């Protein structure tokens, strides 16, 4: 990294808690803006193929944490625990009365922005007592002027009745892109490792959004009124944790603009071409 995070104090709450905006750059001049108010992304600024800048987050600042924890913490000012070279780490603690799990829980959220325009989100939850815990991550994208199609790398999905069925027997078979309407099925891959889940594509802008996750479930919904596409990664069920045990999950959003054949004409191949 040759650039560093820029930190700006936006305001202080009535209780005196500081609300910051962090601008995290990478070496290509693309950057993300995040804030500790709700642990939210307020901007994803990337260069289009013509080198103009686009904000994929749009006008709204939306929390990353979803599910039952997100409902409780979406308006909370999180503590800033760490400011790294290309990441920030936020933390919050809920007492048993406020926790959706019935016990006190410590929650952490780390946002990292790296070269090649990869946004990495890590979510942590540690209960003070044994409890069944579930966490969820959300990333929201401005869809103005775009018509996204979606394909999945997952082997199965849940149908409208909640039954698990093979992707090979659905409209998404063969990694075919299907139009993104209101809401997709839930795509399932029960492998515990980080793996590709879904990909979104807009042919007009040549934009590709790839979602990798350690969660076993992913879905996508389209909000026409707000001109947004909401990507959700989550666990299909609760995970039973012991006292002090930490549940960790991660999401990677890859942002790419594909090149047309015309753009590739005249480009001399190099020994490294196979890597791109």
Task: Give a label for each model feature.
Residues 2-276:
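An exposed, glycine/acidic-rich loop-and-rim segment of catalytic or binding clefts
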């Amino acid at each position: 990294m040759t650039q560093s995070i820029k930190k700006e104090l936006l305001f202080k709450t009535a209780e005196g808690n500081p609300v910051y905006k962090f601008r995290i750059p990478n070496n290509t001049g693309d950057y993300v803006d995040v804030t500790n108010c709700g642990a939210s992304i307020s901007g994803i600024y990337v260069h289009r193929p013509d080198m103009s800048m686009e904000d994929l987050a749009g006008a709204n600042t939306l929390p990353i944490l979803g599910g039952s924890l997100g409902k409780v913490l979406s308006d909370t000012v999180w503590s800033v625990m760490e400011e790294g070279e290309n990441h920030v780490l936020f933390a919050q603690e809920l007492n048993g009365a406020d926790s959706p799990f019935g016990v006190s829980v410590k929650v952490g959220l780390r946002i990292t922005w790296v070269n090649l325009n990869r946004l990495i989100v890590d979510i942590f939850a540690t209960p003070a007592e044994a409890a069944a815990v579930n966490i969820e991550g959300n990333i929201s994208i401005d869809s103005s002027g775009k018509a996204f199609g979606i394909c999945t790398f997952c082997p199965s999905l849940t149908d409208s009745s909640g039954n698990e069925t093979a992707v090979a027997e659905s409209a998404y078979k063969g990694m075919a892109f299907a139009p993104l309407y209101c809401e997709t099925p839930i795509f399932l891959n029960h492998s515990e490792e980080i793996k590709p889940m879904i990909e979104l594509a807009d042919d007009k802008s040549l934009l590709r959004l790839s979602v990798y996750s350690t969660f076993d479930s992913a879905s996508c919904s389209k909000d026409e009124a707000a001109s947004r596409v909401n990507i959700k990664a989550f666990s299909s069920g609760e995970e039973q944790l012991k006292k002090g045990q930490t549940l960790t999950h991660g999401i990677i959003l890859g942002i790419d603009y594909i090149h047309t054949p015309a753009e590739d004409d005249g480009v001399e191949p190099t020994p490294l071409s196979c890597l791109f």
